[in-house]
């Protein structure tokens, strides 16, 4: 993995851009009849512990999940502005499917110097700036779907003690091997689940 850019995001600028806003369609409701990248990654961790099932969240979203969506919407405004300033463009809420597995990308960006980038935004309640392995696995899978090896990873960090709110944007180039191995692991997880009679809840009989 090669870090091409690592810089802080001015949250006051983000707030100003949110005030201007951006016109967009609401995201497509989640299709529970399909296999999803994020669910299969979670299922892989469960299988490693001997719990063979397809991981799906059921019920009303937690408030913390809603805050994550709010942060993503704010960063969409920032990434749109960032891309246009560099002669490119940003498209939020992109879906891609391969091997009957759906990935719901936070967005895709095109920049003249780099081409296509997968964009992923995370809100974290820690100041730890390392990219977690679970996030890396997710963006590797999305890179496979988008047929690129470059990622724009934005992380928001909030803590109460001390009270801190900050955000960083990193542009990272992943290795083709890591992308391929991650996707093969996801496909293997799906095949394992099918072999044990598991399926998405939308396909349950």
Region annotations inferred by a language model:
Residues 1, 81, 113, 203-205:
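Polar low-complexity intrinsically disordered regions
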Residues 1-78, 82:
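Charged, glycine-rich intrinsically disordered N-terminal tails and low-complexity linkers that flank
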Residues 40-46, 192-205:
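Cysteine-cluster motifs in flexible loop/terminal segments that predominantly coordinate metals
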């Amino acid at each position: 993995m090669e870090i091409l850019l690592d810089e802080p995001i001015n949250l006051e600028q983000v707030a100003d851009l949110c005030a201007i806003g951006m016109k967009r369609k609401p995201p497509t409701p989640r299709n529970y009849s399909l296999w999803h990248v994020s669910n299969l990654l979670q299922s892989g961790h469960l299988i490693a512990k001997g719990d063979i099932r397809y991981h799906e969240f059921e019920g009303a979203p937690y408030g913390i999940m809603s805050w994550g969506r709010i942060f993503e919407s704010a960063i969409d405004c920032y990434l749109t502005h960032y891309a246009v300033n560099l002669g490119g463009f940003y498209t939020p809420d992109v879906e891609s499917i391969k091997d009957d597995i759906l990935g719901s990308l936070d967005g895709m960006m095109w920049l003249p110097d780099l081409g296509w980038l997968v964009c992923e935004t995370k809100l974290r309640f820690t100041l730890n700036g390392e990219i977690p392995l679970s996030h890396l696995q997710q963006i590797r899978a999305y890179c496979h779907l988008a047929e690129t090896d470059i990622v724009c990873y934005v992380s928001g960090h909030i803590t109460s003690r001390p009270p801190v709110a900050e955000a960083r944007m990193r542009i990272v180039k992943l290795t083709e091997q890591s992308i391929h191995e991650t996707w093969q692991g996801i496909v293997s997880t799906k095949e394992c689940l099918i072999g044990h009679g598991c399926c998405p809840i939308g396909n349950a009989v």
